[in-house]
Regions:
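Glycine/Thr-rich phosphate-binding loops of Rossmann-like dinucleotide-binding domains
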Residues: 100, 124-125, 173-174
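Active-site phosphate-binding strand-loop segment of PLP-dependent enzymes
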Residues: 141-179
């Protein structure tokens, strides 16, 4: 497969979060939108073709995940991390933001403390604050070698916190915390 990574696609006026919300988020449009993880490359042919084939059914009803979907995750986790997981431990969510909001709502109660590690993906803040949990900040430490965790502070905070929302690889630091 050969892909053209030099092709520029104008995504303005396509309801693109990355491009069409610059003015409302930043107050101006003449910025490079590096604030959201969104691709600017054409979708791979085999993905586009699969979507087109599915769209040709002319019915867009409710769908479910085949067992093969979850089995591929179980197999990948075992192959790459030697983790023994089970399909019944998994649930599908339509995105990572939905997933960690559901985790906050399902695994903690109002006024529980939740630790996040800024600088961090801004929806982490919303997931804590919007569900009436107490935000506990464990800022990463910027060193000459890169960002590191403040484990001493984390150990103290973990005594009373009910959850740590961890971003790894870290967004926006763009580094894997555990090498």
């Amino acid at each position: 497969m050969i892909y053209d990574f030099d092709k520029i696609i104008d995504r303005t006026n396509t309801e693109s979060v990355k491009y069409d919300l610059r003015k409302s988020v930043f107050g101006k449009e003449d910025i490079i939108p590096m604030w959201v993880a969104d691709m600017d490359f054409p979708t791979a042919d085999f993905i586009r073709e699969a979507i087109i084939e599915r769209a040709k059914t002319d019915v867009y009803g409710y769908t479910f995940r085949e067992d093969a979907y979850f089995e591929s995750i179980v197999n990948w986790l075992n192959r790459h991390h030697q983790w023994e997981t089970k399909i019944e431990w998994m649930s599908f969510t339509p995105g990572i933001v939905n997933a960690f909001n559901l985790a906050v709502m399902g695994l903690t109660n109002e006024n529980d403390e939740i630790i996040i590690q800024p600088p961090v993906y801004h929806p982490f803040f919303y997931a804590v604050n919007n569900h009436n949990r107490k935000l506990v900040l464990n800022p990463l430490i910027d060193t000459d070698e890169g960002y590191i965790m403040n484990f001493d502070l984390l150990e103290q905070q973990a005594k009373t916190a009910k959850m740590l929302i961890l971003s790894n690889p870290h967004n926006p630091v763009a580094d894997s915390i555990f090498k």
